[in-house]
Amino acid sequence: MANRKKQGKSKEKDNGWEERVVQVKRVTKVVKGGKKLSFRVILVVGNEQGQVGVGVGKASDVIGAVKKGVTDAKKHLVTVPLTKSNSIPHPINGISGAAQVILRPSAPGSGVIAGGSVRTVLELSGVQNILAKQLGSNNTLNNARAVLNGLTQLRTFSEAAKDRGVPIENLYSK
């Protein structure tokens, strides 16, 4: 599975940000003179070091929609706390609309076990060992946003200890 072909179109930029197109959809708007065609692009931007964002762009051509999507994704960046094994600190659920995503940390070497837009978001965030399951809706955009919702809820051990007002040693089981 390590040699699996990357999903979507990928561009590597010189400043370390990678963008991947998840979905290109041709949409129409009915106006007085007929139907007006445009394109809606869902894409994910990430630096594979703990920052990731999902953006949507609409324009009359695909290239313009991608540019708008990149700026939208960079406006909605999320920072992900990664562990030493490039996983997440604890299991979490993310919800967006009717889409629900379960994210669970996994053992080193297991890889990203997820599908669709969930996989793309997790890979570009820098997570390398994780189990993810989509529940409810199969909507691409809502599943990507559900992952972001889950990733924003993650807390490290030090943050949890600080919130509870106890030393970090008390959080570890004896």
Swiss-Prot record:
Residues 17-80 form the S5 DRBM domain. It comes from the Eukaryota. One of its GO terms (cellular component) is small ribosomal subunit. It is found in: Plastid, Chloroplast. GO terms for biological process: translation. Disulfide bonds: none annotated. The keyword Transmembrane helix does not apply. Keywords: Chloroplast, Plastid, Ribonucleoprotein, Ribosomal protein, RNA-binding, rRNA-binding. The keyword Plastid applies. One of its GO terms (molecular function) is structural constituent of ribosome. InterPro entries: Ribosomal_Su5_D2-typ_SF, Ribosomal_uS5, Ribosomal_uS5_bac-type, Ribosomal_uS5_C, Ribosomal_uS5_N, Ribosomal_uS5_N_CS, Ribsml_uS5_D2-typ_fold_subgr. Belongs to the universal ribosomal protein uS5 family. Part of the 30S ribosomal subunit. Contacts protein S4. The N-terminal domain interacts with the head of the 30S subunit; the C-terminal domain interacts with the body and contacts protein S4. The interaction surface between S4 and S5 is involved in control of translational fidelity. With S4 and S12 plays an important role in translational accuracy. HAMAP family: Ribosomal_uS5_B. This is Small ribosomal subunit protein uS5c. It comes from Porphyra purpurea.
